[in-house]
Amino acid sequence: STAGKVIKCKAAITWEIKKPFSIEEIEVAPPKAHEVRIKILATGICRSDDHVTAGLLTMPLPMILGHEAAGVVESTGEGVTSLKPGDKVIPLFVPQCGECMPCLKSNGNLCIRNDLGSPSGLMADGTSRFTCKGKDIHHFIGTSTFTEYTVVHETAVARIDAAAPLEKVCLIGCGFSTGYGAAVKDAKVEPGSTCAVFGLGGVGLSTIMGCKAAGASRIIGIDINKDKFAKAKELGATECINPLDCKKPIQEVLSEMTGGGVDYSFEVIGRIDTMTAALACCQDNYGTSVIVGVPPASEKITFNPMMLFTGRTWKGSVFGGWKSKESVPKLVADYMEKKINLDGLITHTLPFDKINEGFELLRTGKSIRSVLTF
Protein backbone atom coordinates (compact mmCIF):
# COMPACT_ATOMS: atom_id res chain seq x y z
CA SER A 1 0.00 0.00 0.00
CA THR A 2 2.99 2.35 0.46
CA ALA A 3 4.78 1.34 -2.77
CA GLY A 4 5.33 4.31 -5.07
CA LYS A 5 4.37 6.80 -2.35
CA VAL A 6 6.35 9.09 -0.07
CA ILE A 7 6.59 7.56 3.43
CA LYS A 8 6.62 9.72 6.55
CA CYS A 9 8.58 8.17 9.41
CA LYS A 10 10.96 8.78 12.32
CA ALA A 11 14.69 9.28 11.83
CA ALA A 12 17.62 10.43 13.96
CA ILE A 13 19.21 13.39 12.18
CA THR A 14 22.70 14.77 12.70
CA TRP A 15 22.19 18.49 12.01
CA GLU A 16 25.64 19.53 13.25
CA ILE A 17 28.68 17.95 14.89
CA LYS A 18 29.08 17.61 18.66
CA LYS A 19 25.31 17.79 19.16
CA PRO A 20 22.90 14.98 20.15
CA PHE A 21 20.88 13.16 17.51
CA SER A 22 17.53 14.82 16.86
CA ILE A 23 14.58 12.48 16.27
CA GLU A 24 12.41 14.06 13.58
CA GLU A 25 9.64 13.17 11.19
CA ILE A 26 11.11 12.85 7.70
CA GLU A 27 9.80 12.08 4.23
CA VAL A 28 11.36 9.14 2.38
CA ALA A 29 10.85 9.21 -1.39
CA PRO A 30 10.03 6.04 -3.35
CA PRO A 31 13.01 4.17 -4.81
CA LYS A 32 14.10 5.16 -8.31
CA ALA A 33 15.41 2.72 -10.95
CA HIS A 34 17.67 0.02 -9.46
CA GLU A 35 16.98 1.21 -5.91
CA VAL A 36 15.33 -0.51 -2.95
CA ARG A 37 13.36 0.98 -0.07
CA ILE A 38 13.91 -0.91 3.18
CA LYS A 39 12.02 -0.90 6.47
CA ILE A 40 14.82 -1.00 9.06
CA LEU A 41 14.04 -3.23 12.05
CA ALA A 42 17.39 -3.28 13.90
CA THR A 43 20.57 -1.20 13.68
CA GLY A 44 23.84 -1.37 15.58
CA ILE A 45 25.72 1.62 16.99
CA CYS A 46 29.24 1.69 15.53
CA ARG A 47 32.24 3.83 16.46
CA SER A 48 32.39 5.12 12.86
CA ASP A 49 29.01 6.81 13.36
CA ASP A 50 30.42 8.49 16.47
CA HIS A 51 33.50 9.63 14.52
CA VAL A 52 31.15 11.70 12.36
CA THR A 53 29.27 13.26 15.28
CA ALA A 54 32.61 14.06 16.96
CA GLY A 55 33.92 15.78 13.83
CA LEU A 56 36.72 13.24 13.24
CA LEU A 57 35.21 12.14 9.93
CA THR A 58 34.05 14.99 7.71
CA MET A 59 30.65 14.41 6.13
CA PRO A 60 28.12 16.72 4.44
CA LEU A 61 25.43 17.69 6.97
CA PRO A 62 22.58 17.38 7.79
CA MET A 63 22.79 13.60 7.52
CA ILE A 64 21.13 10.39 8.67
CA LEU A 65 23.92 8.20 10.03
CA GLY A 66 23.88 4.45 10.72
CA HIS A 67 25.29 1.69 8.50
CA GLU A 68 25.03 -1.61 10.43
CA ALA A 69 21.46 -2.85 10.10
CA ALA A 70 18.91 -5.39 8.98
CA GLY A 71 15.37 -5.00 7.73
CA VAL A 72 12.71 -5.95 5.20
CA VAL A 73 12.29 -4.75 1.61
CA GLU A 74 9.23 -2.46 1.44
CA SER A 75 9.34 -1.73 -2.30
CA THR A 76 11.68 -1.83 -5.29
CA GLY A 77 12.39 0.58 -8.11
CA GLU A 78 12.20 -0.12 -11.82
CA GLY A 79 14.64 -2.79 -13.05
CA VAL A 80 15.27 -4.48 -9.70
CA THR A 81 15.07 -8.23 -10.27
CA SER A 82 17.15 -9.76 -7.45
CA LEU A 83 14.94 -8.52 -4.58
CA LYS A 84 11.23 -8.32 -3.85
CA PRO A 85 9.02 -6.80 -1.13
CA GLY A 86 9.13 -8.89 2.05
CA ASP A 87 12.72 -10.10 1.60
CA LYS A 88 14.87 -9.90 4.74
CA VAL A 89 18.01 -7.94 3.91
CA ILE A 90 21.18 -6.30 5.20
CA PRO A 91 22.22 -2.96 3.63
CA LEU A 92 25.87 -2.84 2.50
CA PHE A 93 28.13 0.19 2.97
CA VAL A 94 30.56 -1.54 0.58
CA PRO A 95 28.44 -2.38 -2.48
CA GLN A 96 29.18 -5.15 -4.98
CA CYS A 97 28.30 -4.17 -8.54
CA GLY A 98 30.08 -7.19 -10.01
CA GLU A 99 31.46 -5.16 -12.92
CA CYS A 100 34.29 -2.90 -11.66
CA MET A 101 37.93 -4.00 -11.23
CA PRO A 102 37.78 -4.54 -7.43
CA CYS A 103 34.61 -6.65 -7.89
CA LEU A 104 36.16 -8.68 -10.72
CA LYS A 105 39.52 -9.26 -8.98
CA SER A 106 39.47 -12.28 -6.67
CA ASN A 107 41.34 -10.38 -3.94
CA GLY A 108 39.38 -7.11 -4.26
CA ASN A 109 36.24 -5.97 -2.45
CA LEU A 110 36.09 -2.14 -2.44
CA CYS A 111 33.54 -1.69 -5.24
CA ILE A 112 33.93 1.69 -6.99
CA ARG A 113 30.25 2.44 -6.28
CA ASN A 114 31.19 3.06 -2.62
CA ASP A 115 30.68 6.48 -1.02
CA LEU A 116 33.58 6.17 1.45
CA GLY A 117 36.60 8.12 0.17
CA SER A 118 35.05 11.42 -0.95
CA PRO A 119 31.51 11.15 0.38
CA SER A 120 28.81 12.99 -1.55
CA GLY A 121 26.03 11.89 0.78
CA LEU A 122 23.79 11.44 -2.26
CA MET A 123 22.38 8.63 -4.35
CA ALA A 124 23.96 7.72 -7.72
CA ASP A 125 21.85 10.33 -9.55
CA GLY A 126 23.18 13.12 -7.31
CA THR A 127 19.99 13.57 -5.28
CA SER A 128 18.73 12.55 -1.82
CA ARG A 129 15.68 10.43 -0.97
CA PHE A 130 15.30 12.10 2.46
CA THR A 131 13.71 15.44 3.32
CA CYS A 132 12.91 17.07 6.67
CA LYS A 133 11.21 20.44 7.17
CA GLY A 134 11.66 21.14 3.48
CA LYS A 135 15.41 20.46 3.52
CA ASP A 136 17.27 17.64 1.78
CA ILE A 137 19.03 15.31 4.24
CA HIS A 138 22.23 13.53 3.18
CA HIS A 139 22.71 9.77 3.03
CA PHE A 140 25.58 8.14 4.95
CA ILE A 141 27.93 5.85 2.95
CA GLY A 142 25.04 4.61 0.83
CA THR A 143 23.11 3.15 3.77
CA SER A 144 21.63 5.55 6.42
CA THR A 145 20.03 3.19 8.92
CA PHE A 146 19.10 5.48 11.84
CA THR A 147 15.65 5.76 10.28
CA GLU A 148 12.52 3.63 10.03
CA TYR A 149 12.88 3.58 6.23
CA THR A 150 15.89 4.04 3.98
CA VAL A 151 16.63 3.83 0.25
CA VAL A 152 19.74 2.08 -1.08
CA HIS A 153 21.04 0.98 -4.48
CA GLU A 154 20.35 -2.67 -5.33
CA THR A 155 24.11 -3.33 -5.49
CA ALA A 156 24.24 -2.38 -1.79
CA VAL A 157 21.73 -4.92 -0.44
CA ALA A 158 22.16 -8.59 0.48
CA ARG A 159 19.14 -10.88 0.81
CA ILE A 160 19.48 -13.15 3.85
CA ASP A 161 17.81 -16.18 5.45
CA ALA A 162 14.16 -15.35 6.22
CA ALA A 163 14.52 -17.07 9.62
CA ALA A 164 17.50 -14.97 10.75
CA PRO A 165 16.96 -12.83 13.90
CA LEU A 166 17.53 -9.29 12.61
CA GLU A 167 18.48 -7.86 16.03
CA LYS A 168 21.50 -10.23 15.98
CA VAL A 169 22.56 -10.52 12.34
CA CYS A 170 22.53 -6.73 11.84
CA LEU A 171 26.12 -6.88 13.22
CA ILE A 172 27.15 -8.68 10.03
CA GLY A 173 26.46 -5.38 8.23
CA CYS A 174 29.67 -3.94 9.71
CA GLY A 175 31.25 -4.72 13.07
CA PHE A 176 31.48 -8.49 13.10
CA SER A 177 32.36 -8.93 9.42
CA THR A 178 34.95 -6.15 9.52
CA GLY A 179 36.87 -7.58 12.47
CA TYR A 180 36.47 -11.29 11.77
CA GLY A 181 37.40 -10.88 8.10
CA ALA A 182 40.46 -8.76 8.91
CA ALA A 183 41.91 -11.85 10.60
CA VAL A 184 40.67 -14.76 8.49
CA LYS A 185 40.50 -13.12 5.06
CA ASP A 186 42.82 -10.09 4.85
CA ALA A 187 45.65 -11.08 7.23
CA LYS A 188 45.12 -14.81 6.62
CA VAL A 189 46.23 -15.63 10.16
CA GLU A 190 48.00 -19.00 10.26
CA PRO A 191 47.55 -21.79 12.82
CA GLY A 192 49.95 -21.57 15.76
CA SER A 193 50.68 -17.87 15.23
CA THR A 194 50.82 -15.02 17.75
CA CYS A 195 48.45 -12.05 17.31
CA ALA A 196 47.99 -8.67 19.00
CA VAL A 197 44.69 -6.78 18.78
CA PHE A 198 44.69 -3.08 19.68
CA GLY A 199 41.20 -2.00 20.77
CA LEU A 200 38.63 -4.30 22.36
CA GLY A 201 35.35 -2.82 21.14
CA GLY A 202 32.93 -4.79 18.98
CA VAL A 203 35.23 -4.86 15.94
CA GLY A 204 38.33 -5.70 18.00
CA LEU A 205 36.54 -8.57 19.74
CA SER A 206 35.39 -9.83 16.33
CA THR A 207 39.04 -9.72 15.22
CA ILE A 208 39.93 -11.84 18.26
CA MET A 209 37.24 -14.35 17.24
CA GLY A 210 38.74 -14.43 13.74
CA CYS A 211 42.25 -15.05 15.11
CA LYS A 212 40.92 -17.88 17.25
CA ALA A 213 38.97 -19.41 14.35
CA ALA A 214 42.14 -19.30 12.23
CA GLY A 215 44.01 -21.29 14.88
CA ALA A 216 46.24 -18.63 16.47
CA SER A 217 47.87 -20.05 19.61
CA ARG A 218 48.41 -16.71 21.37
CA ILE A 219 46.06 -13.73 21.11
CA ILE A 220 46.98 -10.61 23.09
CA GLY A 221 44.25 -7.99 23.61
CA ILE A 222 45.30 -4.38 24.24
CA ASP A 223 43.00 -1.69 25.67
CA ILE A 224 43.13 1.09 28.27
CA ASN A 225 39.74 -0.06 29.62
CA LYS A 226 40.30 -3.10 31.86
CA ASP A 227 36.55 -3.70 32.02
CA LYS A 228 36.80 -5.18 28.51
CA PHE A 229 39.36 -7.85 29.40
CA ALA A 230 36.93 -10.50 30.72
CA LYS A 231 34.83 -10.40 27.54
CA ALA A 232 37.97 -10.49 25.38
CA LYS A 233 39.18 -13.63 27.16
CA GLU A 234 35.73 -15.20 26.92
CA LEU A 235 35.84 -14.73 23.12
CA GLY A 236 39.39 -16.00 22.59
CA ALA A 237 42.11 -13.68 23.94
CA THR A 238 44.78 -15.61 25.82
CA GLU A 239 45.93 -12.50 27.73
CA CYS A 240 45.19 -8.77 27.92
CA ILE A 241 47.37 -5.72 28.58
CA ASN A 242 46.58 -2.14 29.60
CA PRO A 243 49.32 0.10 28.08
CA LEU A 244 48.81 2.55 30.96
CA ASP A 245 50.19 -0.12 33.32
CA CYS A 246 53.40 -0.51 31.30
CA LYS A 247 56.66 1.29 32.05
CA LYS A 248 57.78 0.95 28.41
CA PRO A 249 56.03 1.72 25.09
CA ILE A 250 53.52 -1.01 24.30
CA GLN A 251 55.41 -2.13 21.18
CA GLU A 252 58.52 -2.84 23.29
CA VAL A 253 56.45 -4.74 25.86
CA LEU A 254 54.88 -6.90 23.14
CA SER A 255 58.23 -7.54 21.47
CA GLU A 256 59.72 -8.73 24.78
CA MET A 257 56.66 -10.87 25.59
CA THR A 258 56.81 -12.66 22.25
CA GLY A 259 60.55 -13.07 21.75
CA GLY A 260 60.92 -10.50 18.98
CA GLY A 261 57.45 -9.44 17.90
CA VAL A 262 54.04 -10.83 16.98
CA ASP A 263 53.18 -12.54 13.69
CA TYR A 264 50.06 -10.43 13.17
CA SER A 265 48.83 -7.18 14.70
CA PHE A 266 45.53 -5.38 14.19
CA GLU A 267 44.83 -1.72 14.93
CA VAL A 268 41.10 -1.53 15.59
CA ILE A 269 40.88 1.95 17.12
CA GLY A 270 41.61 4.51 14.40
CA ARG A 271 44.48 6.44 16.03
CA ILE A 272 47.78 7.38 14.39
CA ASP A 273 49.89 6.54 17.46
CA THR A 274 48.42 3.05 17.85
CA MET A 275 48.79 2.37 14.10
CA THR A 276 52.55 2.93 14.30
CA ALA A 277 52.77 0.99 17.60
CA ALA A 278 50.92 -1.94 15.99
CA LEU A 279 53.37 -1.92 13.08
CA ALA A 280 56.39 -1.71 15.39
CA CYS A 281 55.23 -4.63 17.56
CA CYS A 282 55.30 -7.01 14.57
CA GLN A 283 58.23 -9.33 13.96
CA ASP A 284 60.53 -7.15 11.85
CA ASN A 285 61.06 -9.63 9.00
CA TYR A 286 57.74 -11.39 8.46
CA GLY A 287 55.19 -9.67 10.70
CA THR A 288 51.96 -8.32 9.22
CA SER A 289 50.07 -5.35 10.65
CA VAL A 290 46.52 -4.57 9.53
CA ILE A 291 44.77 -1.20 9.90
CA VAL A 292 41.10 -1.90 10.66
CA GLY A 293 40.10 1.23 12.62
CA VAL A 294 38.90 4.19 10.54
CA PRO A 295 41.73 6.75 10.50
CA PRO A 296 41.01 10.40 11.34
CA ALA A 297 40.49 12.38 8.13
CA SER A 298 42.97 15.22 8.62
CA GLU A 299 45.98 13.48 10.18
CA LYS A 300 49.16 12.25 8.49
CA ILE A 301 51.29 9.34 9.60
CA THR A 302 55.09 9.49 10.06
CA PHE A 303 57.25 6.41 10.57
CA ASN A 304 60.74 5.06 9.94
CA PRO A 305 60.69 3.29 6.53
CA MET A 306 63.28 0.81 7.86
CA MET A 307 60.31 -0.81 9.66
CA LEU A 308 59.05 -1.94 6.25
CA PHE A 309 62.42 -2.46 4.55
CA THR A 310 63.24 -5.35 6.87
CA GLY A 311 60.21 -7.28 5.61
CA ARG A 312 57.14 -6.27 7.59
CA THR A 313 53.82 -5.96 5.75
CA TRP A 314 51.47 -3.06 6.51
CA LYS A 315 48.02 -3.18 5.00
CA GLY A 316 44.48 -1.94 5.40
CA SER A 317 41.22 -3.84 5.57
CA VAL A 318 37.77 -2.59 4.53
CA PHE A 319 34.74 -4.67 5.55
CA GLY A 320 37.09 -7.55 6.37
CA GLY A 321 37.97 -8.07 2.71
CA TRP A 322 34.58 -9.69 2.03
CA LYS A 323 32.83 -9.29 -1.30
CA SER A 324 29.72 -7.98 0.38
CA LYS A 325 26.69 -9.11 -1.60
CA GLU A 326 27.91 -12.70 -1.94
CA SER A 327 29.56 -13.06 1.49
CA VAL A 328 26.96 -11.54 3.84
CA PRO A 329 24.31 -14.25 3.21
CA LYS A 330 26.99 -16.91 3.89
CA LEU A 331 28.01 -15.23 7.16
CA VAL A 332 24.34 -15.13 8.21
CA ALA A 333 24.11 -18.85 7.37
CA ASP A 334 27.20 -19.46 9.53
CA TYR A 335 25.46 -17.69 12.42
CA MET A 336 22.32 -19.77 11.94
CA GLU A 337 24.49 -22.92 12.06
CA LYS A 338 26.17 -21.63 15.26
CA LYS A 339 29.59 -21.42 13.58
CA ILE A 340 30.04 -17.79 14.66
CA ASN A 341 29.05 -15.97 17.85
CA LEU A 342 27.26 -12.62 17.53
CA ASP A 343 25.29 -12.79 20.78
CA GLY A 344 28.47 -12.37 22.86
CA LEU A 345 29.08 -8.95 21.29
CA ILE A 346 25.65 -7.46 22.08
CA THR A 347 25.57 -5.91 25.55
CA HIS A 348 22.55 -3.62 25.16
CA THR A 349 19.31 -3.66 23.15
CA LEU A 350 17.45 -0.34 23.21
CA PRO A 351 14.39 1.17 21.52
CA PHE A 352 15.31 3.50 18.65
CA ASP A 353 14.30 6.65 20.52
CA LYS A 354 17.03 5.90 23.11
CA ILE A 355 19.74 6.43 20.45
CA ASN A 356 21.51 9.18 22.41
CA GLU A 357 21.71 6.88 25.45
CA GLY A 358 23.19 4.18 23.23
CA PHE A 359 25.93 6.52 22.04
CA GLU A 360 26.67 7.58 25.61
CA LEU A 361 27.19 3.90 26.51
CA LEU A 362 29.68 3.65 23.63
CA ARG A 363 31.58 6.83 24.56
CA THR A 364 31.90 5.86 28.23
CA GLY A 365 33.12 2.33 27.41
CA LYS A 366 30.11 0.68 29.05
CA SER A 367 28.93 -1.18 25.94
CA ILE A 368 30.45 -3.49 23.37
CA ARG A 369 27.61 -3.33 20.83
CA SER A 370 24.27 -1.66 21.41
CA VAL A 371 21.47 -2.56 19.02
CA LEU A 372 18.54 -0.20 18.42
CA THR A 373 15.21 -1.81 17.55
CA PHE A 374 12.19 -0.21 15.88
From Swiss-Prot:
UniProt-annotated binding residues for NAD(+): G199, L200, G201, G202, V203, G204, D223, K228, V292, G293, V294, R369
Name of the protein described by the UniProt record: Alcohol dehydrogenase 1
PANTHER family for the chain: ALCOHOL DEHYDROGENASE, ALCOHOL DEHYDROGENASE 1A
Major location (coarse): cytoplasm
Location within or outside the cell: Cytoplasm
Cross-referenced Gene3D superfamilies: Medium-chain alcohol dehydrogenases, catalytic domain, NAD(P)-binding Rossmann-like Domain
Bilayer-crossing regions: none
Organism: Alligator mississippiensis (American alligator)
Similarity comment text for this entry: Belongs to the zinc-containing alcohol dehydrogenase family. Class-I subfamily.
EC class of the enzyme, as a word: oxidoreductase
GO MF term list: all-trans-retinol dehydrogenase (NAD+) activity; zinc ion binding
Cofactor(s) annotated in UniProt: Zn(2+)
InterPro entries: ADH-like_C, ADH-like_N, ADH_Zn_CS, GroES-like_sf, NAD(P)-bd_dom_sf, PKS_ER
